[in-house]
């Protein structure tokens, strides 16, 4: 099988892979959301990028659909038809959207993909309700198909949800811990949080597709672990974009994570470096950081090597994901498509 380093040379295939999977999943996703209460369905459609407030067709592009693509490719890589992965794809997309709805509320993020977050557009209570509905709908989606693998798939999704909540809880608690000292957040704690918060659902997406296609347990486990490594790399990418990302691309203010005092990996790595004391003093100031202060903080993180070290860790996580996929017995063509998708995500990170 082609290693990830080789796949990195040809990332243009990824957009076509994502488009194919989105088009396959879209009818089932639309049908599932359409069964909700009309008001809740509108909020869900808005969150998914299908419509604007009031239900008019969306004028902005929707998300890439990485998780649903992983479920479809997981089914194909296990030797099954793409359609076998569709229930898993719908379920993980609904759970992902539910998590974003609640995450934006907890973090106070007013923007999502360049427009008001659901809680800003519709209100906090309605956004919580829409998230709850999507969570319930995800479980229902997996139980609807009369397949011998549905029960195992629901158990797998439930375990991923448990980890997702654990990761989100850790992320919220990190905010109250000091920047330095014995109570500060350690890099190992960050890795555990990222695997749960982001990696659990990516691993679940790959594993669900394979599971619904009837793959053996070893293959399902290998794909789940690969997705978890991918999730850590994905979270690191978000951390980097949260400090240095272009607002036109991210839809969020530049240096937003620094302004909010988030314990992201580039910052944690910079704090452990020799020049970390100045950064800790700046971030630990009781006064809110103004534009000048957050720009200086970003500079200090980069000078201390936090940005470069985070990039290295992202590459290491991607290599681990690639190694796990190489160890599994996967159908050649879908496996190559998975690698092309990993390549795209690697470029997003690097």
Question: What kind of region is each of these model predictions?
Answer:
Residues 40-44, 110, 241-250, 277-284, ...:
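A glycine-biased, small/acidic residue-tolerant capping/turn segment at secondary-structure junctions
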Residues 30, 34-40, 58-64, 129, ...:
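All-alpha helical catalytic cores of prenyl diphosphate-utilizing isoprenoid enzymes
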């Amino acid at each position: 099988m082609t290693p990830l380093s080789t796949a990195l040379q040809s990332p243009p295939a990824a957009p076509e892979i994502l488009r194919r999977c989105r088009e396959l999943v879209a009818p089932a996703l639309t049908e599932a959301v359409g069964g909700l209460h009309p008001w809740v369905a509108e909020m869900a459609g808005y969150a998914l990028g299908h419509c604007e407030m009031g239900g008019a067709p969306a004028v902005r592009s929707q998300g890439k659909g990485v998780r649903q693509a992983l479920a479809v490719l997981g089914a194909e890589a296990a030797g099954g038809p793409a359609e076998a992965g569709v229930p898993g794809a719908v379920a993980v997309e609904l759970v992902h959207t539910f998590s974003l709805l609640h995450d934006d509320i907890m973090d106070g993020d007013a923007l999502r993909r360049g427009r008001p977050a659901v809680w800003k557009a519709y209100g906090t209570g309605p956004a919580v309700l829409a998230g709850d509905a999507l969570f319930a709908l995800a479980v229902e989606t997996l139980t609807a198909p009369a397949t011998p693998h549905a029960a195992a798939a629901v158990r797998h999704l439930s375990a991923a949800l448990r980890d997702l909540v654990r990761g989100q809880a850790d992320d919220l608690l990190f905010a109250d811990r000091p920047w330095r000292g014995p109570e500060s957040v350690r890099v190992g704690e960050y890795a555990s949080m990222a695997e749960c918060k982001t990696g659990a659902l990516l691993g679940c997406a790959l594993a669900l597709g394979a599971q619904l296609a009837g793959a053996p347990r070893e293959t399902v486990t290998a794909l789940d672990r690969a997705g978890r490594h991918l999730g850590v790399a994905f979270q690191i990418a978000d951390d980097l974009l949260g400090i240095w990302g272009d607002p036109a691309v991210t839809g969020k203010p530049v240096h937003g994570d620094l302004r909010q005092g988030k314990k992201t990996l580039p910052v944690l790595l910079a704090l452990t470096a020799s020049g970390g004391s100045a950064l800790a003093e700046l971030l630990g100031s009781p006064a809110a950081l103004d534009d000048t202060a957050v720009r200086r903080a970003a500079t200090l993180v980069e000078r201390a090597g936090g940005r470069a070290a985070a990039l290295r860790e992202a590459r290491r996580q991607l290599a681990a994901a690639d190694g796990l996929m190489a160890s599994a017995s996967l159908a050649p063509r879908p496996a190559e498509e998975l690698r092309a998708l990993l390549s795209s995500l690697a470029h997003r990170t690097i």
